[in-house]
Amino acid sequence: MAAITFHLDVVSAEKKIFSGRVETFQVTGSEGELGIFHGHTPLLTAIKPGMVRIVKLHGEEEFIYVSGGIVEVQPGTATVLADTAIRGEELDAAKAEEAKRRAKENILNQHGDMDFAQAASELAKAIAQLRVIELTKKRR
């Protein structure tokens, strides 16, 4: 029996990152983790910085880092519109580690609520990038 699929587009302000048929995808929404399958109820929600895990035909996985944005689900199609989207294999582990180190340093040396919020956001983004890199390497 053939897998039931739907169309998914992952786009950023710069370019289309992914377009194709998928069995499912997961993303971090504003209220928690979302798993989207064919036939999902229509949905429009904000997404947090993190990973889009795409399961294509035959269980093949792809991981994409997103810095935030929105996800829209309609019958037979879904779109992830990200502020920034980068395929796992295109992420730079050294840059992500350095961003993580700087963010931790900024949290320790913060001078107000705004500094802390910005540093915490940068730390979350760096950790998400490192997680996508890790999962992409495991897949190979």
From Swiss-Prot:
Keyword annotations of the record: ATP synthesis, Cell inner membrane, Cell membrane, CF(1), Hydrogen ion transport, Ion transport, Membrane, Transport
Gene Ontology cellular-component annotations: plasma membrane; proton-transporting ATP synthase complex
One Gene Ontology term of the molecular function aspect: proton-transporting ATP synthase activity, rotational mechanism
Membrane topology category: Peripheral membrane protein
Main localization category: membrane
Ligase listed as a keyword: no
Subcellular location: Cell inner membrane
NCBIfam families for this protein: ATP_synt_epsi, PRK00571.1-4
Its job: Produces ATP from ADP in the presence of a proton gradient across the membrane.
Family under the similarity heading: Belongs to the ATPase epsilon chain family.
The protein's name: ATP synthase epsilon chain
Source organism (scientific name): Vibrio vulnificus (strain YJ016)
Taxonomic classification: Bacteria, Pseudomonadati, Pseudomonadota, Gammaproteobacteria, Vibrionales
Gene giving rise to this polypeptide: atpC
